[in-house]
């Protein structure tokens, strides 16, 4: 789907009465890299059990002090060599994936580790940067539902905005990754806009269950050589997909001690884009993005009955310090040095296996969530092992339930098993471990909300819903009563609502008819469960 460069935003088409946002990049799927940038759319416990390494804790305490500590310098040695598209069967030794230029200045601990161009684009004085507001229930804009109704047992497994905000990526039970552009109606100058159903512009099919997926950390739609997606699926290599064409660009292979191909359970690109970190059983493997294939660095997390055991199920990098966090299905969190993987601290406190991690933009706090665990936990890196506070959410299954932070670090948003989306205001100082209550909750649909993603530049919240439905045994009728023509196992009480939805969170006028029942397309109904 191509977006015209001639379109301009009209304040009247916004869900709010605010003025237009700054310029937004074109979607990777648009393939028109010579065009001018497209304008943006208008529109609980007293004390949890914590296990820490005394020596490691002291080390990380010295390195991760308050903001007055000496900055840590990190030098990135990145290859600028670009690669052709590489077939999965044959990967030349000299093949490489594109990364940023080598003449990049050193970054200090207080700087965000993002791509730095030689000539930064000028910022128009008239540009306005949006901020999120949850003083009222978000307004529904558009969504996609027909795409996930072709199979009776299909459901979404999360959604992730691209780093530049040009498009959104989804995962689903049919083993297909889909990329959607922003709705074209957001560029309309009409006062009354009827949003059509969103249609994916790309579909990338994996061979089996997708374990994890992620965007390239320096992805920019203006640079096609940075627009790609990584995915890992059962009994398959790690695949790199072209976000412009949907073609396979490269593969990374990991092998166990029997020289058998093994699949990664979690993926995360380093902030500078030079490395791909992958989680395995008691191991993190680090691949160089400039050299696809099987060559990698193996970092063991558990040795001699010490360390972090279990499958490394999620990974996240600190935006301000040279370290990364690993969550495992063994219910532990580990902090490791970026350069050599040396352990810094080991934390515990969750009741189930860790499924998602997220660092605060300031780099001092990070959040963790687990399966079959009713709490999100917040940790302070300046005091390793100290739990800052907890946030309650309903997670009663083994499904991965995502949460996300807005770019300013003020709001944290999470779904839950019953479908309710909760929003917490985490700004301010919290010195004691306590329960933090949400400032607002709302119900997008009557099914599990497993994915939430906050747009990096616009007040747009994306939600993904659905869960696996297990059949229930049917009761045989009493003697003399007619028996229903139903199988012994039935899904007649299940009403799945599998859909991707976009919500405007810019603090505009109240949405019309908030209590109106949802129609067959899945749009219109938003139920406020509670607000403060």
UniProtKB/Swiss-Prot annotation:
Q: Name one GO molecular function term.
A: protein-folding chaperone binding
- GO CC annotation: Cajal body; chromosome, telomeric region; cytosol; site of double-strand break; telomerase holoenzyme complex
Q: Which domain of life is it from?
A: Eukaryota
> What post-translational modification information does the record give?
Phosphorylated at Ser-61 by ATM in response to DNA damage, promoting its interaction with histone H2AX and localization to sites of DNA double-strand breaks.
Residues modified as Phosphothreonine are: 474
**Modification Phosphoserine, positions:** 27, 61, 83, 476
Give its localization. Nucleus, Cajal body; Chromosome, Telomere; Chromosome
Q: Does the keyword NAD apply?
A: no
Q: Which SUPFAM superfamilies match?
A: WD40 repeat-like
Q: Name one GO biological process term.
A: telomere maintenance via telomerase
Please name the InterPro entries in this protein's record.
SWT21/TCAB1_mRNA_Telomere (IPR051150), WD40/YVTN_repeat-like_dom_sf (IPR015943), WD40_repeat_dom_sf (IPR036322), WD40_rpt (IPR001680)
Keyword Zinc-finger carried by entry: no
What's this chain's function? RNA chaperone that plays a key role in telomere maintenance and RNA localization to Cajal bodies. Specifically recognizes and binds the Cajal body box (CAB box) present in both small Cajal body RNAs (scaRNAs) and telomerase RNA template component (TERC). Essential component of the telomerase holoenzyme complex, a ribonucleoprotein complex essential for the replication of chromosome termini that elongates telomeres in most eukaryotes. In the telomerase holoenzyme complex, required to stimulate the catalytic activity of the complex.
Subunit structure, as described in the record = Component of the telomerase holoenzyme complex composed of one molecule of TERT, one molecule of WRAP53/TCAB1, two molecules of H/ACA ribonucleoprotein complex subunits DKC1, NOP10, NHP2 and GAR1, and a telomerase RNA template component (TERC). The telomerase holoenzyme complex is associated with TEP1, SMG6/EST1A and POT1. Interacts with the chaperonin-containing T-complex (TRiC) complex; which mediates the folding of WRAP53/TCAB1. Interacts with COIL. Interacts with SMN1. Interacts with RNF8. Interacts with histone H2AX.
What this protein is called in its record is Telomerase Cajal body protein 1
Which species is this UniProt entry from?
A: Rattus norvegicus
Q: Which gene encodes it?
A: Wrap53
């Amino acid at each position: 789907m191509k977006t015209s460069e001639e379109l301009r935003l009209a304040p009247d088409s916004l869900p709010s009465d605010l003025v237009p946002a700054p310029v937004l990049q074109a979607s990777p799927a648009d393939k028109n890299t010579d065009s001018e940038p497209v304008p943006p759319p208008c529109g609980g416990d007293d004390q949890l059990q914590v296990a820490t390494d005394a020596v490691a804790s002291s080390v990380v305490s010295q390195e991760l002090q308050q903001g007055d500590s000496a900055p840590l310098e990190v030098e990135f040695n990145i290859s600028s060599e670009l690669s052709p598209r590489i077939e999965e069967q044959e990967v030349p030794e000299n093949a490489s994936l594109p990364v940023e230029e080598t003449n990049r200045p050193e970054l200090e601990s207080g700087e965000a580790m993002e791509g730095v161009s030689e000539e930064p684009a000028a910022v128009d004085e008239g540009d306005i940067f949006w901020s999120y507001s949850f003083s009222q229930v978000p307004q529904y804009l558009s969504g996609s539902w027909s795409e996930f109704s072709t199979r009776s047992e299909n459901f979404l497994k999360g959604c992730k905005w691209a780093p530049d905000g040009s498009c959104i990526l989804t995962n689903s039970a049919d083993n297909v990754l889909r990329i959607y552009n922003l709705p074209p109606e957001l560029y309309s100058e009409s006062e009354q806009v009827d949003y059509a159903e969103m249609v994916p512009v790309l579909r990338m099919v994996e061979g089996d269950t997708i374990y994890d997926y992620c965007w390239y950390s320096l992805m920019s739609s203006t640079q096609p050589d940075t627009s790609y997606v990584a995915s890992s699926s059962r009994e398959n290599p790690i695949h790199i997909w072209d976000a412009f064409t949907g073609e396979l660009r490269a593969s990374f292979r990991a092998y166990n001690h029997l020289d058998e191909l093994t699949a990664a359970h979690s993926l995360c690109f380093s902030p500078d884009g030079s490395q791909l970190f992958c989680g395995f059983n008691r191991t993190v493997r680090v691949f160089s993005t400039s050299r696809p294939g099987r060559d990698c660095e193996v970092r063991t997390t558990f040795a001699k009955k010490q360390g972090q055991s279990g499958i490394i199920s999620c990974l996240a990098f600190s935006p301000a310090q040279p370290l990364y966090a690993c969550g495992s299905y063994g219910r532990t969190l580990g902090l490791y040095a970026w350069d050599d993987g040396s352990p810094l601290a080991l934390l515990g406190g969750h009741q189930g296996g860790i499924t998602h991690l997220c660092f605060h933009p300031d780099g001092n706090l990070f959040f963790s969530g687990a399966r079959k665990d009713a709490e999100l936990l917040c940790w302070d890196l300046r005091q390793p092992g100290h739990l800052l506070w907890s946030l309650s959410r309903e997670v009663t299954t083994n499904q991965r339930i995502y949460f996300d932070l807005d770019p300013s670090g003020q709001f944290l948003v999470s779904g839950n098993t019953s479908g309710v989306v909760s929003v917490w205001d985490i700004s301010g100082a919290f010195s004691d471990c306590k329960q933090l209550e949400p400032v607002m909750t709302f119900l997008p649909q009557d099914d599990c909300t497993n994915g939430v993603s906050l747009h990096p530049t616009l007040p747009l919240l994306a939600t993904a819903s659905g869960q696996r439905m297990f059949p229930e045994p049917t009761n045989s009728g009493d003697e003399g009563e007619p028996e229903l023509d139903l199988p012994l196992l039935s899904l007649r009480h299940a009403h799945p609502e599998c859909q991707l939805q976009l919500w405007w969170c810019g603090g505009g006028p109240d949405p019309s008819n908030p209590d109106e029942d949802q129609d067959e397309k899945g749009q219109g109904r938003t139920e406020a469960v509670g607000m403060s």
